[in-house]
Amino acid sequence: MDLERYKEQERRRLDSLLRDRGASPEERRASIQKLRLRQNEYMHDRYNALLTGPAEFWIESERMERYERRQLLGDLWAEGEIAVLGGRSGIGKSIFAVHLATALAAGEAFGPYPAAEPRRVLYVDLDSSPELFARRYSRNVDGRPAPYEFPEGFLRSVFEWDTPLPPGYESMESLIFDSIIESAANNNCRTIIIDSLPQIAAHGKQRNLIDFLLRFKWLRDSGKASILLIAETTPVGRTPDAVSHDIAGPGIVKSVADSIFTLSPRRRSPHV
C-alpha cells in the first residue's frame, strides 16, 4: 500500500471513530486500542516515524486510557503512575505509607479516598529498623505487646546496608533496584512503595540515584508497576518555618513523577 493511500484510510478511521457518539466506552476504547496497534506498526515505516491524527483523537485516546486506570489514592496516584510523597523529617510519611499500603492490600477506603480492589503491595522499607517497625505497629493487650494484623497482601522488604556488592554491580542503587524487581516479580506485586529516597541517597552518589530513578521511569513506562516514592522536602525561603517547601534531591525526582503531594502540619495546629 502506498503512503498517501494509507494516510487517507487512517484519516477516515479516525473521523469515523470520533463521530460515533453512540458507542459505549468499552467499544470506543477497543476501537482506539486497535487503531493504536495499527499506528504502532506503521510507526516503523521508512517513510514516516510520526503518528498523526486530529487533536481530538489524542484527547479522547488519553481519556480512555485514563478511564482504564484504577485510582489508588484518588487523583493523587493511579495505576501505572509514579507518585512522590514529600514531607519534612518526622512529619509521619512512613506511617502514612504503611497505612496506605494496608488499605490497598485489604481493598479498603483510605480516609476520604475510595477503596480500590485488593492488591499485593510491596513496601520497601529502607528507613525503619526491625525494632522500630515492631514498636510502631504493636499494641498493648493485657500487658503484652500484640502485633497489628496486616492483610496477607501487605509485603515488607528490608535491605541490609552492609551487604557487599556482588560481582557485576558498580553501585548499591543498582543492587537495590534489581532486588526490588526480583522481589516484586517473585511475589506478584505490581504496586510498590519505596521508603525512602533520602536513605538511598545517603548511601550512594547523586548520579547513581538519578540512574535509579530513570530505571523506575522505565518500569512505569513499560506498564508493569505503580510506584510511590517517599521523599524529603526542604523549606523555601530564608526562615526555618517557611510555609512553602520543595522536594529535596536532584531535579529528576520531579521530572519522573506523574504527581507530587506532601504531608504538612496545619497552620493553626501542630497536627498533620
Question: PLM features: what roles do these ranges have?
Answer:
Residues 67, 89, 115-211, 218:
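Conserved inter-motif catalytic segment of the P-loop NTP-binding fold
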Residues 45-72:
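N-terminal pre-Walker A segment at the start of P-loop NTPase domains
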Residues 79-83, 119:
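Pre-Walker A (Motif I) flank of P-loop NTPase domains
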Residues 105, 109:
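Gly/Ala-rich phosphate-binding loop of Rossmann-like dinucleotide-binding domains
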Residues 63-70, 174, 241-244:
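Short gly/ser/thr-rich secondary-structure transition/capping motifs
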Residues 96, 100:
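Hydrophobic positions on the alpha1 helix immediately C-terminal to the Walker A/P-loop
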Residues 84-85, 90, 95, 191, ...:
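Phosphate-binding/switch region of NTP-binding enzymes
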